[in-house]
Amino acid sequence: IVSERYTPYLTTKHPAEILTIANHILGTGQLSLAKFVFITADDTNQLSTHHVQEYFEYILSRLDLGNDIHFYTKTTMDTLDYSGEGLNAGSKVVIAAYGDVKRNLATTVPTRLLDLNMDASLVMPGVIAVNAATYTTAALQNALIGQGEALLEQEGVVMMIRTEDPKWMASALNNFLSAAFTRT
């Protein structure tokens, strides 16, 4: 959680200084090994990273999926990424969300997903886990063609994760964090 001070006179809030700080994090010592950076600013100073679910909800409710996700691919910064094409050719992602609330997050699995006979569980507001055994990535994409914007804007689903066991992932926040962010 940082301060956003580059353009305090603008009425529209968007990440600016936040991105500078995220790049600083990715370029500093052991921090450069980070695979995911979730970063935001809180003008009220009420938000805390010690309250992980609240922090995620804050970011997910403000996230502009078209502008706030920044990928670094084939970067030499990441020597611990074994999914790359070679040594020191990994990837990272910065999710930098700031500004006014853009959506209310889903607090139940949306009916449109249940109607598709998905084995899905609500992990936390805005995050749904889907059983990988019942839907391949391609099948999931085909089933949801044309529904992505509605799931996001009307239903408040920001993140869907395919997993072997959606109920396990949803049973504890640490299960979600471990499976989603340390195994990719």
Task: List each language-model region with its residue ranges.
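Charged, compositionally biased interaction regions
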Residues: 1-184
